[in-house]
Amino acid sequence: MHPLVEKHRSELKALALRHGLRDVHVFGSMAREDARADSDVDLLVDVPPGTSAFVLGAMLMDAQDLLGRRVDIVTRSSLNPVLRERVLREAQRL
């Protein structure tokens, strides 16, 4: 896991809990530790049924403020079937 994510791991988990999200993982270059200075942070989350898109938007903005980088949030149910296996294989739980 990239040092930036590791440094803010507990804060990211707290943000997720505050927004009612669970089982948060990092994937992509930040999980593989081949991120560049301009790489974004990819987060995979499980959302309870009925969760509003506003909740994901709030989590996204809070995570970007915390990390000082662009963040992408993907729900497990919305994973692209073509990429699903790779994402799940490399995902690391926060």
What are the roles of these predicted feature ranges?
Residues 28, 42:
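Conserved G/P- and acidic residue-centered "switch" motifs that form tight phosphate/ATP-binding loops
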Residues 44-46:
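Short hydrophobic/aromatic beta-strand micro-patches
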